[in-house]
């Protein structure tokens, strides 16, 4: 029988929470139900939302609820069809292990990473700024691999990631976690 095709935009390839589509495709789960997925990876929820809103894809996965609700409130033709996570405990912000930055309150004038404009990480960084009265410089850095490179090379002071990304660097004491997404009261 012919498979129905769905084109998905999925943010942050390799994160645990964004692997469901790819794992399901490889395991034949979607095929068993008459579906074939075409998966397009983005650098974050902002790009995922843009792809879905423009009609470039059928579904945006891990699109960031705060950004989606904001887009909906502005009249974008979006609908939430399922929750991926509750809260933002899967996201974390980190520094190089030898950084003098010990907490978010030490980030004055420092660069504070988020993935893309309109993403959950952007919303959380914005919430950090307001909640803690920070004077950091929010900076879009894309996905976790590029962000880590920027942190380790000194281009960015505070990076962001989601497991499993960065766990090796954490175990090897190359990086140190400063905050979780749940440290933003709005999330």
Stretch-by-stretch model annotation:
Residues 14-41, 70-74, 123-130, 169:
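Short, polar/charged alpha-helical segment
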Residues 6-26, 43-45, 64-65, 117-120:
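Extracytoplasmic "Venus flytrap"
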Residues 3-4, 70-81, 168-183:
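Ligand-binding "clamshell"
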Residues 3-17, 35-41, 109-113, 137-139:
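Short, well-ordered beta-strand elements
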Residues 51-53, 71, 107, 150-152:
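Hydrophobic residues within well-ordered alpha-helices
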Residues 145-187:
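Pocket-lining segment of extracytoplasmic ligand-binding domains
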Residues 39-50, 63-66, 137-155, 162-164:
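Short helix-initiation/N-cap motifs at beta->coil->alpha
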Residues 96-111:
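Flexible hinge/capping segments at coil-to-helix
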